[in-house]
């Protein structure tokens, strides 16, 4: 078998992204009746690309407003595209959230609303609840991002501090008919978790949000605590009649990207093991992947080389150092430290939105010589991991993957390629 391992890994990553791109997946899910007036709103890293599809396919009058991350915009003719900050919200996100809410207020039962939702929407559609400031939300968001909290935990807190999340946007649209089309970036593809579920009923409680804040030792102002202890902080609950005409449709999820990559692997002659959506600390998840790789190499279990291990989901990083890098660089650095130059093992870890954390790269690639090459440059994988400096480590090896914004987001993508004769 003749294959360029790094090229194959890059092709797998591209295949995973393409399988979840709005241009490929949205049109088939739009309403059969595409005539008449429709109001389009949206939030997330894929919002602009999704809006382009609606403009292309809709036969009637189209107008609306979507918000996406800075640099993730795309030109639309009828739908306004605004950019704002992610992962920590800014004034632009606050302003557009107010405009979105105004746009859907006072609608009639004859109106139709299309809501285009994707990962990043929680930060991009930032409208603090009464008595809570944007600065409060920014501070709490930053603390959550560094705490190691899961995306579900973070979004539980976010929706209970919001005037637009947790079903509140859907309630504001009543009595119009609402069609939400979502691209999932969360493990389990829960509608209540994707961008904090602005148009779906939410079973979580303010008490749970307070428990999460306590669990991770996050300091909050007295005004925020008072709000979370009030009845008004509760989100829109299942059975609320204001959501009776709100419909939710998942159009892309991480599993279909993993499945598409697996097909590509088999076409190249590699068997695959799909581990699915994973959560946990990036460095610990990497150690599990390393253990599976060693089991394959040493014992041919659970499958024999040549093969590829695929996984997705959203890991977390508890920041202890002052280095640079997102969760995928952290994963790959921990994998490098665990395998220590294991022959015949190559790996890629990247974020399908094209941005790993807050850096300019999507991810990075590890090769069998990464560990030794870095050591020759005076870089210790273990020390750099302690400093959360995955970006700096792989930048020194010229091994960063830079894709620019992809305008979709089905979260992390990881592929470990194991060649035959990989034993030391």
Where is each model-derived feature located?
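Glycine-rich oxoanion-binding loops at beta->alpha junctions
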Residues: 68-109, 152, 157-158
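An N-terminal, well-structured beta->alpha segment
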Residues: 1-41, 49-50
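Active-site segments that bind and position negatively charged phosphate/pyrophosphate groups
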Residues: 269-349, 358
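Accessory alpha-helical/coil subdomains and C-terminal extensions
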Residues: 176-179, 201-290
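Gly/Ser/Thr-rich active-site loops/lids in small-molecule metabolic enzymes
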Residues: 132-149, 202-217, 321-347
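Glycine-rich, mobile lid/loop segments that gate access to catalytic sites or pores
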Residues: 105-193, 198-201, 378, 386-389, ...
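Internal helix-turn-beta structural module
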Residues: 332-423
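A glycine- and small-aliphatic-rich helix-loop capping segment at beta-alpha/alpha-beta transitions
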Residues: 53-62, 78-80, 101, 105, ...
């Amino acid at each position: 078998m003749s294959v360029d391992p790094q090229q194959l890994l890059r092709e797998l990553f591209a295949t995973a992204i393409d399988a979840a791109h709005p241009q490929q997946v949205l049109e088939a899910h739009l309403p059969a009746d595409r005539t008449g007036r429709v109001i389009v709103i949206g939030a997330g890293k894929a919002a602009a690309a999704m809006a382009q599809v609606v403009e292309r396919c809709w036969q009637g009058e189209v107008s609306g407003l979507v918000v996406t991350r800075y640099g993730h915009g795309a030109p639309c003719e009828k739908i306004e595209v605004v950019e704002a900050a992610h992962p920590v919200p800014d004034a632009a996100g606050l302003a557009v959230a107010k405009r979105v809410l105004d746009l859907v207020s006072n609608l009639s039962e004859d109106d139709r609303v299309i809501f285009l939702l994707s990962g990043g929407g929680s930060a991009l559609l930032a409208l603090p609840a009464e008595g809570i400031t944007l600065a409060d939300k920014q501070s709490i968001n930053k603390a959550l991002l560094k705490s190691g909290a899961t995306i579900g935990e973070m979004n539980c807190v976010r929706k209970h501090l919001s005037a637009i999340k947790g079903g509140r946007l859907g309630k504001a649209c009543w009595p119009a008919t609402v069609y939400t089309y979502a691209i999932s970036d969360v493990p389990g593809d829960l509608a209540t978790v994707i961008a904090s579920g602005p148009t779906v009923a939410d079973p979580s409680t303010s008490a749970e949000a307070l428990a999460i804040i306590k669990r991770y030792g996050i300091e909050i102002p007295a005004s925020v605590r008072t709000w979370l202890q009030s009845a008004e902080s509760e989100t829109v609950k299942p059975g609320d009649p204001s959501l009776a005409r709100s419909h939710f449709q998942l159009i892309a999820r991480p599993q279909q990207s993993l499945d598409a990559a697996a097909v590509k692997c088999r076409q190249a002659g590699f068997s695959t093991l799909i581990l699915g959506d994973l959560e946990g600390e990036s460095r610990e998840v990497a150690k599990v992947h390393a253990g599976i790789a060693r089991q394959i190499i040493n014992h041919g279990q659970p499958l024999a080389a040549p093969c590829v291990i695929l996984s997705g989901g959203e890991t977390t990083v508890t920041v202890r150092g002052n280095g640079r890098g997102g969760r995928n660089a952290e994963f790959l650095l921990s994998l490098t430290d665990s395998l220590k130059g294991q022959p015949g093992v190559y790996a890629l870890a990247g974020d399908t939105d094209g941005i790993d954390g807050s850096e300019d790269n999507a991810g990075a690639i590890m090769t069998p010589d990464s560990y030794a090459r870095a050591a020759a440059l005076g870089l210790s994988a273990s020390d750099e991991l302690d400093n959360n400096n995955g970006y700096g480590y792989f930048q020194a090896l010229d091994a960063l993957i830079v894709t620019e914004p992809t305008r979709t987001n089905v979260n992390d993508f990881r592929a470990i390629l194991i060649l035959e004769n990989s034993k030391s």
